């Protein structure tokens, strides 16, 4: 096989893998993992069922690939070079990053919510995302201490629960949910809570 043929073959393989991942993400998010068939994924991705299984041995492997490809987008990143900024600015930046993820990747957020409702997948999701959650908790805790939180560990979980609630309501009715108003109110609410 010529170098050009190898390059084209790699590109085609990457393109078909990407199509499978995109189709599966949408179907798993909208229908649920168990309710989605490999035939539906093949049809949506416009590939053969055999091609799906040449990339992934099982439907579970497709989901694991989605998690591997997308896990770092579940948690917005903190800017590590923002030591000079005050805690409120950092929190606003974090909330904005998380809300951008929610707006740009609602299917990914919906899939995460669905998986968290399924005990077996919740364990897998937690295991896969463990390092990211630990980074999130460490950085969020430090930010909360800076911001004046008296119970930063509990506040980390409280913020997580608030984010889950916002995410669930937004993906259920994105056109009706006042996301920008919630963002502004959430920052003010958290800071007034810590100041008391």
Whereabouts are the PLM-identified features?
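N-terminal intrinsically disordered/low-complexity leader segments
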Residues: 1-15
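Hydrophobic alpha-helical segments that form the core
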Residues: 151-172, 181-191
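Helix-turn-helix
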Residues: 19, 23, 27-61, 65
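Short alpha-helical scaffolding segments that buttress acidic/His motifs in well-ordered protein cores
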Residues: 98, 112-116, 159, 163
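Amphipathic alpha-helical packing segments from all-alpha helical-bundle domains
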Residues: 75, 104, 121-147, 154-157, ...
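Short, basic, alpha-helical segments at the C-terminal edge of helix-turn-helix-like DNA-binding modules
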Residues: 68-74
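Amphipathic alpha-helical segments used for helix-helix packing
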Residues: 102-123
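Hydrophobic alpha-helical connector segments
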Residues: 65, 79-104, 146, 156-159
């Amino acid at each position: 096989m010529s170098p050009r043929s190898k390059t084209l073959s790699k590109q085609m393989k990457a393109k078909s893998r990407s199509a499978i991942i995109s189709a599966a993400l949408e179907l798993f998010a909208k229908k649920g993992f168990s309710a989605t068939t490999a035939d539906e994924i093949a049809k949506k991705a416009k590939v053969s069922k055999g091609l799906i299984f040449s990339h992934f041995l099982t439907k579970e492997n497709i989901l694991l690939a989605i998690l591997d490809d997308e896990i770092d987008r579940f948690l917005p990143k903190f800017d590590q070079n923002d030591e000079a900024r005050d805690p409120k600015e950092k929190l606003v930046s974090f909330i904005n990053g998380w809300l951008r993820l929610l707006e740009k990747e609602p299917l990914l957020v919906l899939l995460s919510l669905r998986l968290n409702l399924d005990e077996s997948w919740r364990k897998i999701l937690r295991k896969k995302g463990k390092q990211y959650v630990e980074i999130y908790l460490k950085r969020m805790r430090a930010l909360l201490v800076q911001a004046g939180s008296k119970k930063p560990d509990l506040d980390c979980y409280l913020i997580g629960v608030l984010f889950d609630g916002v995410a669930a309501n937004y993906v259920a009715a994105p056109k009706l949910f006042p996301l920008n108003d919630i963002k502004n109110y959430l920052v003010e609410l958290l800071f007034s809570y810590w100041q008391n």
